[in-house]
Amino acid sequence: MEERHKCKLCWKSFANGRALGGHMRSHMLIHPLPSQPESYSSSMADPGFVLQDRESETESSKKPSRKRSRLNRRSISSLRHQQSNEEGKSETARAADIKIGVQELSESCTEQEPMSSVSDAATTEEDVALSLMLLSRDKWEKEEEESDEERWKKKRNKWFECETCEKVFKSYQALGGHRASHKKKIAETDQLGSDELKKKKKKSTSSHHECPICAKVFTSGQALGGHKRSHASANNEFTRRSGIIISLIDLNLPAPSEEEEMASSVF
């Protein structure tokens, strides 16, 4: 471990300048800067001055949402212990030590720029790996859903579906019984239809009265009876006329005697 990454206040050594910078910030939180003489710079005299490392200065413009490193509880407890040991020092000496530590920290962070670029590359690789992992998980879930759907389709193909009402049954026997109920309903419907047709025909025949001689139809029996009487009178007239024709003299026959003439005149 190099000596340049050592804290000038508590003489702790660190692996890189970034860790040393975080440690120096803890010193600034525990030991606020006193009123500085005019020889110190305005930045050091500002009570709101906060020590930042090289990475936070360069990346604040690029990645403002990136979180800074947090203090460890163990380091805070050690700093409190160091504070109790350094109470004997004067405030001016502590301020001078802080200024020297800040200068050395800035120099060490300048030299450690390649390390920050390497860490950025590692972070980028981690992000890419995380994205690939999420994509692979999404693809796995989609395949899982597709397999469930295919399994359901295969299971449905094993079932038996009624073509009339689209009901599904687990066995062919159940489907056969269901189809029998459909056939029974159809037969009952056909029987009702035939009965209704017969009734309609019967009503139509009973409501109409047809003459057997000329096939005329009448709405009532009385009208049909009057029509039949007309047929009877016509028959009598035809018979009478036929009798008259028979009683005529035939020139081809011999002349009748007087007795036959008297008999024909009586009729």
Curated annotation (Swiss-Prot):
Q: What coarse category fits the chief subcellular location reported for this protein? A: nucleus
**Superkingdom of origin organism:** Eukaryota
What this chain does, per the record? Probable transcription factor that may be involved in stress responses.
Per its UniProt record, what Pfam families does this chain match?
zf-C2H2_6
Which segments carry the region annotation Disordered?
Answer: 34-99, 181-204
Q: Which gene encodes it?
A: ZAT1
Q: List, alphabetically, the PROSITE patterns matched.
A: ZINC_FINGER_C2H2_1, ZINC_FINGER_C2H2_2
Can you name this protein?
Zinc finger protein ZAT1
Q: Keyword annotations for this protein?
A: Metal-binding, Nucleus, Repeat, Transcription, Transcription regulation, Zinc, Zinc-finger
Gene Ontology CC terms: nucleus
SMART domains from the UniProt entry: ZnF_C2H2
Q: Where in the cell is it found?
A: Nucleus
- Per the record's keyword annotation, is Nucleotide-binding included, yes or no? no
Amino acid composition bias (Basic residues), ranges on this chain: 63-73
Mark out the compositionally biased spans (Basic and acidic residues).
Answer: 52-62, 83-97
GO biological process, alphabetically ordered: regulation of DNA-templated transcription
Which residue numbers delimit the C2H2-type Zn fingers?
5-27, 160-182, 209-231
Instruction: Decide whether keyword DNA-binding is in the record.
Output: no
One function term, GO molecular function aspect: zinc ion binding
